[in-house]
Amino acid sequence: MLRGQEERKYSIRKYSIGVVSVLAATMFVVSSHEAQASEKTPTNAAVQKETLNQPGEQGNAITSHQMQSGKQLDDMHKENGKSGTVTEGKDTLQLSKYQSTQNSKTIRTQNDNQVKQDSERQGSKQSHQNNATNNTERQNDQVQNTHHAERNGSQSTTSQSNDVDKSQPSIPAQKVLPNHDKAAPTSTTPPSNDKTAPKSTKAQDATTDKHPNQQDTHQPAHQIIDAKQDDTVRQSEQKPQVGDLSKHIDGQNSPEKPTDKNTDNKQLIKDALQAPKTRSTTNAAADAKKVRPLKANQVQPLNKYPVVFVHGFLGLVGDNAPALYPNYWGGNKFKVIEELRKQGYNVHQASVSAFGSNYDRAVELYYYIKGGRVDYGAAHAAKYGHERYGKTYKGIMPNWEPGKKVHLVGHSMGGQTIRLMEEFLRNGNKEEIAYHKAHGGEISPLFTGGHNNMVASITTLATPHNGSQAADKFGNTEAVRKIMFALNRFMGNKYSNIDLGLTQWGFKQLPNESYIDYIKRVSKSKIWTSDDNAAYDLTLDGSAKLNNMTSMNPNITYTTYTGVSSHTGPLGYENPDLGTFFLMDTTSRIIGHDAREEWRKNDGVVPVISSLHPSNQPFVNVTNDEPATRRGIWQVKPIIQGWDHVDFIGVDFLDFKRKGAELANFYTGIINDLLRVEATESKGTQLKAS
């Protein structure tokens, strides 16, 4: 029996030794594989960190699999590290084989994932190297362009390109150049909301090499719309409307934001001039217009057509302004004419009557541009009782004729004056034509009609297209009219060099005339009871007559800008905002208490509903992020919140909230729109020629 027990112990010992040997061999194999895997595979912490950069579900799947594999390996080590826990050798051997198989699968999976990650990192590294090479080539091109510009006397500067948005230095003076490369149609995306920068492509690099003098600035390129395509797209967006003025008042926000008081205003103005605001086009496809800096020896202005700014009621400009009278266009905040000329733009400020009617002002505007002695017309002079001829203008464009156009920008009453002059150019003056046929003599070319294609665009700023209650209830009252005419009478003395614009009515003392005789003569003038003056033309009835006299020109781009500086009080009436020009407090309250609610919101002098567009003419709402290039329809820009009537021209020296940088942005934005009008016209001419 003892011998049997010894044989049994010997068999168990022999079997145990065999099992231990198998386990030792298995652990050796597993350890060798694990060592190899550790050389090729990062640790669990490294894997998890690497996985954070994996996009989407792929990274999550890799992380989960790696963590599961690591857990299995840890479990295996725990199982192998325990001694005396194996009760049955057969089961232990099977478990070891199973774990070995699972570990082999896990290691293969890890190796496959590692190879895939290495491949992706290699591709990403190659992509970065390609981008770096392209950026280096572009920087070299920019350096070459800079040296080339310096050799030609150019003073423009360059800066390094950004790898994300490819921003390049802004150009103070820009000129639209044609580019015949066609582009595919794109969707409308306002640049102010587009935070995604396009990636550089070989096609873009090729374009840069093809035009080494053209710089791709941070501004959106000028984009031109095919005429047929533009009409189709815009008609589907919004059909022209007539008369429904209340739709403009609500839901339109201010494009301007108050400027930080701590910011250097001069630097802001400089930045605004160097980087004028540009707006993307609707259905923007078509030939992108590049910009080129103005060279030091370049005389050609940036704009093809001269821009003429026309002042409003009480406006005095240039040499005709008294010493203490503020600079009409921009005040001391931003001198519009001076600054735009510095940038290379051909701009002018017209000087017309400050108190005269829209009729007289329109005639004077014509001769300001064309040159010559003002001819108000024989019929008009006989009808109202003032002189037929007025002052003589030198003219800024003596060769002004069909095909040679101008851009017209009018503030307040200036917008009405512009519209009437264009109507006379195109359709003539029926009264003057009839009078000329009946009496013979001379007739001004302005009144004969047939002079189309002489105006490219009409832009109005705070213009009372439909009149103002302030004129009805205040400005055109007998008491106020007497004060205005008395002022003209006083300024007409022989020692005064200021012309308020009523000399055709006799408001100018003759050289050999005493002041007493001059007063007696002027007191007999018909102007005291006439409607041929600004006070009447700004009323609701006077403006309605003008609207009936004028029509839309299908070849002209019309744009309006409107401000609002009033708020609704507890009783539902409009009160002037804090900061509104103090001289407009009374007129703002007169308008704000009108019986018609839709006529109450105002800018201090003009109701919002009147400034949007003439009530009897078609209009379309446009955003600040699209160019105003449509023709034959009023394009109504969003209402500018917080801007009163004189904020458009910056003459309120007490308003520290409105700074010159705002005016710089505003007027450079207008100029950019006018350049787009010219570019669109050039594109249309090319299409017709082809």
Curated annotation (Swiss-Prot):
Compositionally skewed regions (Polar residues) per UniProt: 53-71, 93-114, 124-171, 185-206
Pfam families in the record: Lip_C (PF24708), YSIRK_signal (PF04650)
Enzyme Commission no: 3.1.1.3
Entry keywords, A to Z: Calcium, Hydrolase, Lipid degradation, Lipid metabolism, Metal-binding, Secreted, Signal, Zymogen
Propeptide residue span(s): 38-295
Binding site for Ca(2+): 579, 644, 647, 652, 655
Annotated signal peptide: 1-37
Region (Disordered): 53-266
Localisation per UniProt entry: Secreted
GO biological process: lipid catabolic process
Listed Basic and acidic residues bias regions: 72-81, 225-237, 257-266
Entry's Gene Ontology molecular function annotations: metal ion binding; triacylglycerol lipase activity
Active site: 412 (nucleophile), 603 (charge relay system), 645 (charge relay system)
Reactions performed catalytically: a triacylglycerol + H2O = a diacylglycerol + a fatty acid + H(+)
An example Gene Ontology CC term for this record: extracellular region
KW Glycosyltransferase (keyword) present: no
PROSITE patterns: LIPASE_SER
InterPro entries per the UniProt record, alphabetical: AB_hydrolase_fold, Lip-like_C, YSIRK_signal_dom
UniProt cross-references to PANTHER family, sorted A to Z: ALPHA/BETA-HYDROLASES SUPERFAMILY PROTEIN (PTHR34043), ALPHA_BETA-HYDROLASES SUPERFAMILY PROTEIN (PTHR34043:SF3)
Family assignment from sequence similarity: Belongs to the AB hydrolase superfamily. Lipase family.
Protein name: Lipase 2
Lineage, top ranks: Bacteria, Bacillati, Bacillota, Bacilli, Bacillales
